[in-house]
Amino acid sequence: MTKKVFIAEQETLLEVQKQVDKLTNNLLPLDKPIYAMVIHEASDLNPNSRVEYLGANKNFTPMSMNMSTHAMNYGSWADWSWLKANVPVMCNFDGGIDYYLNPNDYTKKADGTDSDVSNVDYAGDAMSVIQKIYKKEYKVGNDRYVFFCERKVDEDFKAVGFNVLGKERDYMLIPMFYGSIDANGKMRSIAGQWSCLTASGNASDNTTGTAIGTAEQYAAIQKASKNGLFFGGALVNTLADICVLLSKSTNSQAAFGYGMCSTYVEDKAQHYGTQINTVVGGGQFYGSSDQKSFNKIFHSCVMGSYMLWQRDPYMLLKNGRILVSPDYTYDLTGATYLDTGVDLAANGYYATTRVIEDFGSVPTDELVCSSATGYCDHTWVNATILAVSLRFGGCNHGLYDGPFARTLSGVAANAWWGFAASKLLPAPAAA
């Protein structure tokens, strides 16, 4: 259903532009510039023209993926220090970095010796460093303004996704590989392990005879470390927006790769078309258009491959109302979550959002789009239950998938082969 869309008056837009120019030009030294964009959510549904660059990147050339060579052209973004700080590591179960991996060959450490990227007996995981960044975000009419800076400019700049239960972290570690549950019941991010039917599945799918829903996935994450979190929430919102910033497009599959969004086969013996976690070369990003290959964004196959839906209990849909957890509080009742005031009643591709402080944007149903317009990703809704969010997409959903795709149609206990989970680790908190 299309609702009335509010467009700001010209005088308001001119005042906003004046404040944007003042902010981005005068406040910071050049070594820590503000990078910014405005997404014209309602007035332009073309994913390749609705993003306007502002600030230090006003005249930048965006990044672009060569789908044939699978190589990223960094455009004007190659020297961004935040992007350079995104490196692959092996870390202990509590988020301390043990050593750095060769960014172009994960089977090697940075010093050239063999790594533990495929060693399930290693006491830790293969993860990717996401350095803290500050974000300012607001709406003017249906234009969404987003600013990023590596230092806190003022109180409006928040470390969205880096606040863990009230403690701001210097970095977060995102999974390089889809979550798998090992023989000790621990959630892992290790190459050479299956995610489908170890970190997902109903009782008949799994040799243990145990259905793996949200509670079971959380238990596996917590068994590895009490610091462990689901890969979702505010940080994924921040990373999705950075993808838009880097590519100057809201069609992230077209910009970064289509992953494994169309590999499904109706055969449990073949893991329903999913694949075992595999080391993918090519550096920080790897993209393809065949819809049948592991891809990666920020060294993470989970972000780029769309093979299995990822449980994200930091967003719930309670009888049609979106509730969120900005600081990774885990509460499947939603009683302690923030009420966004946003209602969703039906499935759809949504072009507009509402900005939620400390969390990022959530979809609104004011304007419906498609797999080729707006944010290009689909949202499934059941407004009659308490639903737990899933993110990214699965290998049976094709162009419905993407970093803005969500399933808000299943309860926490819903266990299915395609509903998996991966772990997120915060940097150890300062004493």
Functional labels for PLM-detected ranges:
Residues 117, 121-124, 151-304:
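Short aromatic-cysteine micro-motif
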Residues 136-138, 181-182, 238, 309-310, ...:
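Eukaryotic short linear interaction motifs
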Residues 114, 286, 407-408:
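Eukaryotic intrinsically disordered and solvent-exposed regulatory patches
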Residues 318-329:
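A short, polar/charged loop-to-alpha-helix boundary motif
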Residues 35-43, 237, 258-273, 279-281, ...:
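C-terminal, surface-exposed recognition/capping segments
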Residues 25-184, 224-230, 234:
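Extended N-terminal export/anchoring regions of large proteins
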Residues 1-26:
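Short, low-complexity N-terminal tether/leader segments at secretion or assembly junctions of large
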Residues 294-320:
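Extracytoplasmic, non-cytosolic globular domains
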